Amino acid sequence: MIESSAEHNTRLTRTWIYLALLIFIVGLTIFPFLGLQDFNTKGEPREAVVASTMLETGNWILPRNNGGETAYKPPMLHWCVATLSAPLGKVSEYTARIPSAAAATVLALMTFLFFAKRSDVQLGFWASLIFLTTFEVHRAAATCRVDMLLTLFIVGALFQLYQWYERDMKGVPLLAILFMSAGMLAKGPVAVFLPCFVTFIFLWIQSTEVLWRIVLRLMGVALLALLLPAIWYYAAYLQGGESFLQLVYEENVLRFLGKMTYASHENGWYYYFPILAAGLLPYTLTLLFSIFGRPRNGAKYKPVVKINFVRRITEGLRSMNSVELFSFLSILLIFIFYCIPKSKRSVYILPIYPFLSFYIAKLFAYLRNEKPFALRVTGALLAAIAFIVPFGVLAVCEGWIKPSIFHGKHAVENAFLMQNLAAMDFGFLRLLFIIAPIIAAVYYLFHFRDRFRIVQAIFILVFGLYISLEGLFLPLILNPRSDKNVAVRLEQISHQTQHPVYAYVHSTDANNPLHFFTINFYMRNRLHAFDGKQAEGQIIVGEEDLKQLEAQYPAFVFIQKEDLHHRSCDVGQNIGLYTFARKAADAQL
């Protein structure tokens, strides 16, 4: 149906309003909180150290850290982090996480524009908000990892290839090629293969051209996408030689075939089903509640998922409109692809989230008109959480809940967390973070009966909870687990003694060695790997690894200098600082 001029102008105005609102929401709920959490897992500092090494050495091709290792992934993330950090002269938690946050923001805007143009402006807006507020996306958007960047490049390429299809595949899809090139520089050939594979199946089902022409066109696109990355791969080969080629082969081919020389996130074929249910929270609740109840019109109930999903599959994929078909194929094919390798992580399937968000938005539109019960129950549960959490904080601060309730190996950490919470200085911002979910819950209670505002009220609830979580609770919970304070102490000791600090971590796999990544980052890449060539010095080691260290290096004497009273977030052991020296007989030799 052709829009009138007035309808077009109205649609354009709504698009700009929603776009501005989306930018405002992201600016309020993601970027202000990026630097509040210290690095507390080995994944983030491992990537950040590579960017630090780039700034320190000037080697932006294949830098090596103090441990003598090169990065396991191509350098796109490290380039972004190093570029953003260069004006400050160092990499911080905030600058390290900006690329992921920016990628999530750009992808949310692209998701909105893509679906708003091809379905409904409000539906596109809902899809973008759902995408941003799913648990998995929100978490990935605030971490220094490559996965959100890769997701942007894969989904961006898919969107651009669809637009190429709309143009009858005339010309060269330059933006799609650039997205795939950037994706290959982020993680490898998967960023080229997946967009081309999904588009091939889509075009084949649509029967837009004969099969061989589709294959040739997409092969040409893929080859063009390989040109820019080939420059870096060649330059990296000149520096890394055969070991670099072996790393590329292992990380891409052997990982997919499940024949890596070391175990890497190995899980069964069913792994992604529960992981997806968890990653889609809180909207998994809505999907669950939509099964129950009857439509408003009193018709015999049919499962909601049949509205635009199962029924259309049974009637034939070709009966779907092209946007729905393309979205469905993107979900199905990417999901199946990542189920094949043994190596599986929740973030691998992030590229299906924008398309799932579109279907969830369509479900919301149906539920709002026909089954608001499902939305109201979802909102009621979220509102209950929004009320309970602040009162839980009050109970801890008033001493109604005692640290003695905790038992097990994390009892000390949890008790320390409660003590921090009880002793916390409640300034204006922290009070705001605590009451934000209450304000959102009150708004929901005033509007939950209004079926035209209930979806809006649910989004406000979710954002209120995330603001409280990111602004207050996650830093409070996770920062005590970070190795940052240990790194500060080791820096002091190194400065006082005028000697470097060495580190030892026992690893059963030489191809995937563990390190104190977090300590090394906060020591500005000045933590040296112990290899037995040193005559004397000081070394940090986990209490369980100490026996392995003594057995591996019998020519040395290790004496504890200081118990650091901390369980490392990288190696999961209590760590201590030791002095070491060669035994007299060995020293004479």
Give the positions of each predicted feature.
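Membrane-integral, polyisoprenol-dependent glycosyltransferases
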Residues: 1-374, 397, 559-561, 568-576, ...
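Membrane-embedded architecture of ER/inner-membrane glycosylation machinery
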Residues: 2-12, 174, 293-589
